[in-house]
């Protein structure tokens, strides 16, 4: 069925291979849970990764200049993915890289692993995708089916939280398990 998307790759991944796409997001979430499970019990509730002191020099400059540009590029790649090359995973990877760059320079600290906002960012994408999939049972006759004529807006509504979840998950995988400050 026509999706209204100009990018055949996105159309295929979100309509005919939707279960694979859902499981891709779930795998990132499970990988983060796996990394977090490596932390000792005493570290639970701490922040992922080592605490980084503020940097000076080129790293600090790049960490101040690049994230706003990377944010725009990452979001553009997600938006452009509906009609051309790009999409949620590529955009999410760029957003994650910008967060990690700012963390490496000591400009931001990751939130504690028990933070509600962090957990919401991690599960929002898979949860929204699953809810849309269940709605497909009632509206389109099968799990993960999209209602005719509404494919593009529904796909974009799925990709927005998926991008957030993928970006958060990839960044947290790089930061590692939580630790308590000494």
For each predicted feature, which ranges?
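Alpha-helical transmembrane segments of multi-pass membrane proteins predominantly involved
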Residues: 1-182
């Amino acid at each position: 069925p026509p999706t209204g998307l100009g990018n055949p790759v996105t159309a295929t991944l979100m309509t005919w291979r939707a279960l694979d796409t859902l499981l891709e997001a779930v795998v990132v979430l499970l990988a983060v849970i796996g990394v977090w499970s490596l932390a000792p019990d005493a570290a639970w509730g701490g922040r992922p990764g080592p605490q980084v002191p503020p940097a000076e020099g080129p790293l600090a400059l790049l960490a101040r200049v690049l994230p706003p540009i990377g944010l725009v590029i990452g979001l553009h790649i997600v938006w452009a993915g509906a009609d051309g090359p790009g999409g949620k995973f590529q955009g999410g990877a760029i957003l994650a890289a910008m967060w990690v760059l700012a963390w490496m320079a000591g400009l931001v600290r990751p939130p504690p692993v028990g933070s509600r906002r962090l957990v919401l960012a991690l599960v929002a994408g898979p949860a929204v995708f699953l809810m849309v999939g269940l709605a497909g049972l009632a509206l389109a006759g099968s799990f993960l089916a999209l209602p005719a004529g509404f494919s593009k807006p529904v796909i974009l509504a799925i990709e927005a939280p998926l991008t957030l979840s993928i970006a958060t998950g990839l960044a947290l995988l790089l930061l590692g398990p939580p630790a308590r400050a000494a």
